[in-house]
Amino acid sequence: MDTILRLSHITKSFPGVKALADIDLEIARGEIHALLGENGAGKSTLMKILCGIHQPDTGTIEIDGTARHFSDYHDAVAAGVGIVFQEFSLIPHLDAVDNLFLGRELRNRWGARDRKRMRHAAAAIFARLGVAIDLDAPIRALSVAQQQFVEIGKALSLDARILILDEPTATLTPAEAEHLFAIMRELKRQGVAMIFISHHLDEIFAVCDRITVLRDGQYVATTDVARTDVEQLVRMMVGRRIESSFPPKPVRAVDAPRVLEVNELQIERGGPVNRFTLHAGEILGFAGLVGSGRTETALAVIGATRAHRKDVRVRGAAVKLADPADALRAGIGILPESRKTEGLVTSFSIRDNISLNNLGKYRSMRWLIDRRGEARTTHDVMRRVGVKAPSIHTEVATLSGGNQQKVVIARWLNHHTSVLIFDEPTRGIDVGAKAEIYGLMRELTARGYAIIMISSELPEIVGMCDRVAVFRQGRIEATLEGDEIDPDTVMTYATAGTRGATHEPA
């Protein structure tokens, strides 16, 4: 094997936590190598060591057989290591050329920025990737996929020979993800080594050569993709066998009360008019392609965005939901797609996040908060949803994705909501945590909660939902239930429109 990167006996500890224990990793030139593990397994810490962001307590890094010590990120870049973070590091108002050469602009002989040379170099990089990018458009005007390609181009412009891709498909459509995989295969052909981090095991099998699994900061195994399967990988990641990610669906009660009725919703004048109902104890899925109107519909219902016409009833009573505060008073909570920026204050503690929308509940005097009562309630809802953390004072930023999602759920339970909207509830969450979230959702519906689940993952829609509203171009094309909920039927409606099924079963 033509080894380009070797990490040997890497150990790293933080106060009270041993993040990595004697980790080995070996990558070949021109190899796409998957790094797998649950959240908290040590993947991010190991990659931050490789990028010079953290320094190991013990262990060595070798590139092309030469031992390297990275004091910071710039040392790693100089050695040929590049990383494309899940959260982009691009400047939105600058174009692709300026983003590629930010801080290292090419100069002419008079010392002025040589825009022509930089533009030519940028065009050559994107030609190497086989992508078309408008070099003069600001980054904010590009699609998410195009921004991803600019990030990759930025790493390649720094002569990266080892490229780390951290959850690169998290915000891409299936077609965009396939385009990314084509780019990865081309870079592989050119000899670039890639470390691919993803929670989507189907992607691992589609594009990777070998897999290394970490668990609880320890090395578990390295195996060829061709010699393993999904069940074996899951067992290696979580240390146990997961029989099924999805809990069994309960028999739907025919007399379950309607807790939410959207009798008329038109977001824009002249646009489609949608109607749907939600019953106590059920999960209603919103399915469709990215941009089909699923999230837009949910946001319009709760008043987060304006609607041209809207008629909403909660438990039979007409309500005016002009903003999310109105929705909250009506008992509707939302777990937004971007939990870190919209659902949580990550610098706050678990206690403060759970109490955030309900501080009046703990007011002991006019301006004082009953901290003991707040702590008791926080402990209670943490136990109910299964948040794993050392204390209620733990900063939310230090939690895994699955535990962060549970904190958002705990907040709404603390507020006595009856309708919960989950927008991409398992995005960026590992296999074991996904199963926990699914189980929690079913526990909530068993207690009478009603859930709307917006998801781009078809297996999730099919495995979790009692009924599914399929969106296409802003319109609910059909509402499916029972045996109608299968991948082929959902995708047919999402891509080709109505074939004559019932629009809104009772």
Swiss-Prot record:
InterPro entries: AAA+_ATPase (IPR003593), ABC_carbohydrate_import_ATPase (IPR050107), ABC_transporter-like_ATP-bd (IPR003439), ABC_transporter-like_CS (IPR017871), P-loop_NTPase (IPR027417). SUPFAM superfamilies: P-loop containing nucleoside triphosphate hydrolases. ATP binds at G37, E38, N39, G40, A41, G42, K43, S44. GO terms for cellular component: plasma membrane. One of its GO terms (molecular function) is ATP hydrolysis activity. Its main location: membrane. It is a peripheral membrane protein. PROSITE patterns: ABC_TRANSPORTER_1, ABC_TRANSPORTER_2, RBSA. Its EC number is 7.5.2.7. Pfam families: ABC_tran. Keywords: ATP-binding, Cell inner membrane, Cell membrane, Membrane, Nucleotide-binding, Repeat, Sugar transport, Translocase, Transport. It is found in: Cell inner membrane. Residues 5-241, 251-498 form the ABC transporter domain. It catalyses: D-ribose(out) + ATP + H2O = D-ribose(in) + ADP + phosphate + H(+). Belongs to the ABC transporter superfamily. Ribose importer (TC 3.A.1.2.1) family. Part of the ABC transporter complex RbsABC involved in ribose import. Responsible for energy coupling to the transport system. The complex is composed of an ATP-binding protein (RbsA), two transmembrane proteins (RbsC) and a solute-binding protein (RbsB). This is Ribose import ATP-binding protein RbsA 2. It comes from Burkholderia lata (strain ATCC 17760 / DSM 23089 / LMG 22485 / NCIMB 9086 / R18194 / 383).
